[in-house]
From Swiss-Prot:
The gene is fpoH. It is an enzyme of class 1 (oxidoreductase). Pfam families: NADHdh. It is found in: Cell membrane. This is F(420)H(2) dehydrogenase subunit H. It is a multi-pass membrane protein.
Amino acid sequence: MNIMIEIPEFIIPLIPWIRGVVGLVLVGAIFLGAMGAVWLERKLSADIQFRYGPSRVGKFGLLQLVADAIKLFTKEDMRPRNADRLLFDNAPIFMMSSVFLMLVAIPVGAVFINGVEYPLAVTEMDISVLYIEAMSAITIFGIFMIAYGSNNKYSLLGAFRNFARMVGYEVPLGITVVSVAIMTGSLNIVEIASAQGLLWNIFLQPIGFIVFFIALMADMGRLPFDQNESEEELVAGWITEYTGMRFGLGFFAEYIHMILGSFLVALLFLGGWNVPAFVANNPVLGLIAPTGFFLLKTVLVLMTIIGMRWAVPRFRIDQVVDLSWKRLLPLSLLNLVWAVGLGLYLGA
């Protein structure tokens, strides 16, 4: 449901600027959210393993993040002797930038102002789904720049594994997104989220949701798909040679990518910010509940992704390739046929 807010006409021209400010605030909030995701993963992992986890520095160990950040950013910034200086120094910045570029098209809610819908995002694009997919795929170039610039065999092997995995899983991921877009008749992620109402796409396309979630896990490189940085084989994979602040940039880029992936699951399959009518029509809850409900879904998806780390063992690289081409690709095509048929039926 949508929220209606009546405001003076003279404020209407300022709305793009207001939305831009909101978008910048969201960028900062996502960075803090990445720090929170690190703490959440450590605490949730500790609970699963019957440990305490961070508990000494601050209440519930919350200040452990600050302590780790101070330690990380004050470490010596070392560069291998034979590394490519240009690539080695700038690749983490490129990778972080490509992740943040995804954020500008991802909304966290929407309001109706004088009959016009304005999403809470930096910008709204008619092809925002394709834009997000493209920015997500660009991160592989940052990883290759890091690996090649490091002049390290373990880094390069990790990058090759990452490339092999992304090539296989971007295909079913993209087909599933197209299936969702067909149901809505739009590539605008705002329209896809709004069109679901309370009948979420997870109920209309359950197979598509499963394929999308598995492919997204592989795209993010989370267990059981972290063959590109498996400690037993490749030390730390593509980021082996990095220390200090540059290591921190690559590390946080992974967690920000994980948060944005959780956003996409909530937007494409879990109804986004849609709430029941009695909540949307409440003058107080109507302003808070949609975004709060959306963020709650995002946190639940994030906790599921984190929990998978301790629930499923790491796959071999051949198992990863087989799962993509022999399982997920046929299922994604089957879901595409289902989406087309269901779209024609509902349209009729």
